[in-house]
Amino acid sequence: MSRHLRAGRRRWWAEIENCAGIWADFDRVEWYEVGGSSYPCPAYEGRCEGWWQPPHTIYMAQDQTGNRQLAEHEMLHDLLQRGDHPPVFVACGVATQSAW
């Protein structure tokens, strides 16, 4: 991941932490880029643009790496350590239509 992208994600991490009221070390997350705009989703049938795998791995489609809402959505999964979508996803503005 480029230094510029990492710095941006670190800022987004701090903002989603503040919204959720949960704090954790950004550096615990391992980030992976998957080629294209989406990829076959390993967790369910269909395609993914982003996916969080416990405990601290986030996969994002290469064409989506700058998508703040998607990145923060996956970050929130990591902060919460859960794969479902409780109301905090809506409250923090990172609920995505495809996630429901």
What function would you assign to each model-found segment?
Residues 55, 64-69, 81-100:
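Post-HEXXH active-site segment of zinc metalloproteases
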Residues 72, 76-80:
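Short active-site segment of divalent metal-dependent hydrolases/proteases
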Residues 1-64:
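Auxiliary, metal-adjacent structural segments of Zn-dependent hydrolase domains
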Residues 18, 69-70:
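Predominantly single-stranded RNA-binding modules in RNA-associated proteins
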